[in-house]
Regions:
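Active-site loop segments of alpha/beta catalytic cores
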Residues: 1-29, 68, 94-345
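Short, basic/low-complexity N-terminal boundary segments at the transition from targeting/disordered tails
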Residues: 24-46
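Short, charged/polar low-complexity linear motifs in solvent-exposed/disordered segments
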Residues: 29-30, 41, 84-86, 245-246
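Short, solvent-exposed polar/charged micro-motifs at secondary-structure junctions
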Residues: 32-38, 55, 62, 76-79, ...
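Intrinsically disordered, low-complexity, compositionally biased regions/tails
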Residues: 38, 44-46, 67, 77, ...
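Short acidic, Pro/Gly- and aromatic-enriched capping/linker segments at domain boundaries
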Residues: 42-59
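A contiguous, low-structure linker/loop signature
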Residues: 55-103, 119-127
Length: 345
């Protein structure tokens, strides 16, 4: 039998089918030597205006300063105690949408951006993104304390701010989908800790759901499957997410009732993840066999019946040879075990 490509397995599971292999999701990053399940693309005109994902930190397109360090694998966060907005009612004086010429040659830009990305579209699915993380952007402007207070004290001002940013992004999202022709669409917003959501379902429905609806609309109107990245115990919000078109959810951390979620949604919501180092109580004093077993156990728990993709790894600090070894071990074990899983089980 011919081996399915990562893209074929990925698109099959999003379509509610049983794939040949359990897809190994990579969140769009170039990490699998050209055999990635997904890769993200987007207009370079925005990337040139945004430096906040740099290993040295920088500013996002809204003027928020970010910092990064080696302990986080150079993942960036808003610079502590350097927030640009301390009063949500004053956002109109502070937050200014960048000026972008929507009449640029989108076809030429898309052609060059796709060539630069070096993606084999027969092997790898391409996604475009929503570009805006509404809650995360709010706390990037204000910090967690002030941002959460604003949700309760000035909900109409928060709505106005989020709609202002959405007004900026939606035309760009529509142009991106039109010219880059992605296979799917990706949204992100972390709204929970490992213990609970940061705010109530009522606030989600009142403030955030209308924004997510607007951000999802360009994909839904074109029939693109939607993924959503939401860390933590966010199961309270899954009905809403499915309601605006989400087909896969990552990283599906084990603090959620994953088996209950799988039973409730079946293949309509693809659980993507379920593995993390907290599964090993003795971490980091673990053997290779223990690490391998956690991968086997996670896949065997969540893959039967379809509706599942594996994602797992260890954030590696530069110079930490043990963490690097274990991260590689997780990837190799998952690759071997997920390959042709549904033919072997």
């Amino acid at each position: 039998m011919t081996d399915w490509t990562p893209k074929e397995n990925f698109m099959a599971v999003l379509g509610g089918e049983i794939p040949q292999s359990v897809p190994r999701y990579n969140m769009g990053m170039k990490t699998m030597n050209g055999r990635e399940t997904t890769r993200g693309v987007g207009p370079s005109i925005l990337r040139k205006m945004d430096s906040h994902m740099s290993p040295k930190g920088g500013k996002d397109i809204w003027g928020v300063s970010y910092v990064a360090n080696e302990e986080t694998g150079f993942a960036s966060i808003p610079e502590p105690n350097n927030f640009i907005l301390d009063d949500i009612t004053k956002w109109r004086d502070i937050v200014k949408a960048p000026e972008i010429d929507l009449d640029i040659d989108w076809e030429a830009m898309a052609k060059k951006d796709m060539e630069d990305a070096e993606i084999d579209r027969n092997v790898t699915a391409v996604y475009s993104s929503a570009m805006l993380m509404p809650f995360q952007q709010l706390v990037a402007f204000m910090g967690f304390s002030e941002g959460l207070c604003a949700l309760y004290e000035e909900p109409e001002e928060v709505k106005a701010l989020l709609n202002y940013m959405t007004d900026f992004y939606v035309p760009i999202i529509e142009k991106t989908i039109e010219y880059y022709k992605p296979d799917c669409y990706y949204m992100l917003d972390d709204t929970a800790s490992r213990y609970s959501t940061f705010f109530s379902k009522e606030i989600y429905q009142d403030i955030f759901r209308p924004i997510y609806d607007r951000l999802a609309a360009p994909a839904n109107e074109r029939g693109l499957p939607i993924g959503f990245h939401n860390c933590g115990r966010c199961e309270t919000f899954l009905d809403e997410m499915v309601g605006f078109g989400v087909k896969w959810w990552d990283p599906a951390q084990h603090d959620n009732d994953l088996l209950g979620i799988k039973e409730k949604y079946g293949r309509d919501l693809v659980i993507t993840g379920g593995w993390e180092v907290q599964l090993m109580p003795s971490w980091p004093d673990v053997s290779d066999d223990e690490v391998r077993q956690t991968v086997y156990d996670t896949v065997d728990k969540l893959a039967p019946g379809g509706g599942y993709m594996f994602i797992g790894g260890i954030l590696v600090r530069p110079g930490d040879e043990k963490a690097a070894h274990l991260h590689k071990l997780v990837q190799e074990t998952a690759s071997e075990y997920c390959d042709h899983y549904y033919e072997k089980h």
